Amino acid sequence: MEDEIAALVVDNGSGMCKAGFAGDDAPRAVFPSIVGRPRHQGVMVGMGQKDSYVGDEAQSKRGILTLKYPIEHGIVTNWDDMEKIWHHTFYNELRVAPEEHPVLLTEAPLNPKANREKMTQIMFETFNTPAMYVAIQAVLSLYASGRTTGIVMDSGDGVTHTVPIYEGYALPHAILRLDLAGRDLTDYLMKILTERGYSFTTTAEREIVRDIKEKLCYVALDFEQEMGTAASSSSLEKSYELPDGQVITIGNERFRCPEALFQPSFLGMESCGIHETTYNSIMKCDVDIRKDLYANTVLSGGTTMYPGIADRMQKEITSLAPSTMKIKIIAPPERKYSVWIGGSILASLSTFQQMWISKQEYDESGPSIVHRKCF
């Protein structure tokens, strides 16, 4: 397919927006889902200061901006800002006219119905797209791994969910959702760094902590043992240089932060960890298909990028499951983008072409068409 008519695939995550053309093997544009507004009064006349900045530009000017994420826990909470992000995606990042391309959007499972209706409405009414579709993120990740059966543990910045899929069908009764993801881990790391005497408070400083988390954190195979190692030696300590040149040292925070995924009580949450949630999700499925799910547990999303997470999942699920069960955790190296890659695959399938919601269908039925056409 040529770029002229290629479908656009936009995976709007709570933390990062991934966008590009169907048929490509990676997104062309990846930028933070941030809208920033100046905190101060502009004094330089004629500088062309804007009243809002999106994505990387907001990130680079973060020192003078208040940064807002319009998507929280996978749900769009601020539609005006969301429109700015989409506008930025089409016109600045991809440099295309949305009225000339079908658009595939993604959403978290168990999202409010109104959320996808509004997405549909904005695409057709604000951007005049000829056709659009809303796909479930985890299903796309499974496509990207080349499977049609498996359970996907998808964890991004705003929401984590486990979605069992059998022969291409998501099993809605067994989908579980956990509102604990990357952003909560960033906040938790901010908190435990404060205990070490490093104070991070502003929205801009939170981005620094996110970078520390992405570069230095890992998942311990045995948490208690790792805590012992950290207490008795400095072998686990790493240093990080802040933008102002100050160097900070972090030790057990490196694995205490992502440990919250397995022990949400660290964050004061009552929910089960990601290993138990995955197990519970499998147990809600028919007894005949559990074996296939255990053997095809696929990790996806940026919050599954910690070193050691796959081994730890293997260990935890093995201890929960029947002893004879074969358990396989699949952690593709490109899992940060597997939702987008799955969308790219789906939108370029010839069989998918009749699945699009067309402008005409939208004009006839209104936004509710999305529930009938998109699973």
Curated annotation (Swiss-Prot):
Pfam families found in the cross-reference section: Actin
InterPro entries given in the database record:
Actin, Actin/actin-like_CS, Actin_CS, ATPase_NBD
The Tele-methylhistidine modification is found at 73
SMART domains for the chain: ACTIN (SM00268)
Post-translational modifications: Oxidation of Met-44 and Met-47 by MICALs (mical1, mical2 or mical3) to form methionine sulfoxide promotes actin filament depolymerization. Mical1 and mical2 produce the (R)-S-oxide form. The (R)-S-oxide form is reverted by msrb1 and msrb2, which promote actin repolymerization.
On this chain, the residues bearing Methionine (R)-sulfoxide are 44, 47
Task: Tell me the subunit arrangement.
Answer: Polymerization of globular actin (G-actin) leads to a structural filament (F-actin) in the form of a two-stranded helix. Each actin can bind to 4 others.
Full protein name:
Actin, cytoplasmic 1
Where does this protein come from, organism-wise? Answer: Salmo salar
Q: Which gene encodes it?
A: actb
